[in-house]
Structure formats: C-alpha cells, structure tokens
Swiss-Prot record:
Its main location: cytoplasm. Belongs to the class I-like SAM-binding methyltransferase superfamily. RNA methyltransferase RlmE family. Keywords: Cytoplasm, Methyltransferase, rRNA processing, S-adenosyl-L-methionine, Transferase. It comes from Dechloromonas aromatica (strain RCB). One of its GO terms (molecular function) is rRNA (uridine-2'-O-)-methyltransferase activity. This is Ribosomal RNA large subunit methyltransferase E. Its EC number is 2.1.1.166. Pfam families: FtsJ. PANTHER family: RIBOSOMAL RNA METHYLTRANSFERASE, RRNA METHYLTRANSFERASE 2, MITOCHONDRIAL. InterPro entries: RNA_methyltr_RlmE, RNA_MeTrfase_FtsJ_dom, rRNA-MeTfrase_E, SAM-dependent_MTases_sf. Specifically methylates the uridine in position 2552 of 23S rRNA at the 2'-O position of the ribose in the fully assembled 50S ribosomal subunit. It comes from the Bacteria.
Length: 205
C-alpha cells in the first residue's frame, strides 16, 4: 500500500522523536513508558507489592515499567487481543478482557488478591476521522472503567487514556461518580499536538 503524505510525515516525526530514541537506548518497548514513569513519579501508583492489570498492553512499555516498580512482591497482568513478546515477571493473557474465558484466566491467577491498579493506554486503530476516532477511544475507556468497577479493591486506582472532545465531559462525570478523587494528567512525553489526556481515579465510592 502506498503511504500517504500524512503517514510519511508521522513516520519522520516518530523516527526523530526524542522519547522514541531514548526508549530504544534504554530498552523500553515504546515511548509510552516515559508517560507512565512520569505519572507514577507524581502520583505514586506503582507501589511495591501492588497487583496491577495492564489493559491493551501490547507492545508492553507500560508492563515493563510496572513490573520493575512493583518489585518481586507484586504481580503484573497484561491483557491484549494482540500477541506480546514475553516480559520477565509479567503474566500475559491474550484475548478480549470482556470475555468470560479471559476473565476466568485472570481470576484464577489472581486467587484471593485484589487489583490495586488498573491501567489502560488502549487506543483504537485510527481512521483519520476525528469524530470516529474520538468515539472509539472513549468506548475503550468506558470498557476499562467497567472492568475497574468489578476488579479493583476499594482503595484502588484506575489510570486511563482519553481524547479531549465529544463525550469527554460525559466520561469525566462517570469517573467522578465512580471514584472519590479524579485527576487529569498530560505527561511531557505526550506529543503537544495530541488530544490525549490521562484520567486518574482513586478510591472507589
């Protein structure tokens, strides 16, 4: 397939991106690792011994950060429809986290432990049509919120990527109805022109 001018420009920007270069140098699977590290440094999400679920984990940048920071006493579960190269210490489950079979696998591995952090950097396949892409990413965020309501321990946290635009305020309201505190984050590693934000909900109501 012939690349469009837009896709060529994106590829040029991606290759020259400081965070992309730094990720390669330091062995992170994606530039997104720096976003999570910055937010964790600020909000202290990845506590030693914590149980973490990474929704839409592939290629694994966030899982790499999580498993390093929760330490040997913690557990990191990575879920994705796509395959992911193994990461030492990360329990990967391939499949749709809404399906009973996938949830059963997760629950069997969790045992009696409750999840302290659900994190989602999920993004849809972008169509290039802003309204369509906005609707898709907000739907993914809603799925992550539903998952969190069921699986988080009472004092747990949910970190999720959203886009500013249609349905953002509605979703923010849902977050505030679900959690006692909700913060908005825009990490330095997020591209300036990107509409992405991260919402952090803490302590279930």
């Amino acid at each position: 397939m012939k690349r469009t001018r837009t896709s060529k420009a994106w590829m040029r920007e991606h290759i020259n991106d400081t965070y992309v270069q730094l990720a390669r140098k330091e062995g992170w699977r994606s530039r997104a690792a720096f976003k999570l590290m910055e937010m964790d440094d600020k909000d202290k999400l990845l506590k030693h011994g914590e149980v973490v679920v990474d929704l839409g984990a592939t290629p694994g940048g966030w899982s790499q950060v999580a498993v390093k920071r929760v330490g040997d006493g913690g557990l990191v579960f990575a879920l994705d429809l796509l395959e992911m190269e193994p990461i030492h210490g990360v329990h990967f489950i391939q499949g749709d986290f809404r399906e009973d079979e996938v949830l059963q696998q997760l629950e069997e591995q969790l045992g009696e432990r409750r999840v302290g952090l659900v994190m989602s950097d999920m993004a849809p396949n972008m169509s290039g049509v802003p309204l369509v892409d906005q609707a898709r990413i907000m739907h993914l965020a809603e799925l992550g919120l539903e998952f969190s309501r069921v699986h988080l321990k009472p004092e747990g946290a949910f970190l999720v990527k959203v886009f500013q635009g249609t349905d953002y305020e509605t979703f923010l309201k849902q977050m505030r109805e679900t959690f006692k505190t909700v913060a908005v984050r825009k990490p330095d590693a997020s591209r300036d022109r990107s509409p992405e934000l991260y919402l952090l909900g803490r302590t279930l109501r």
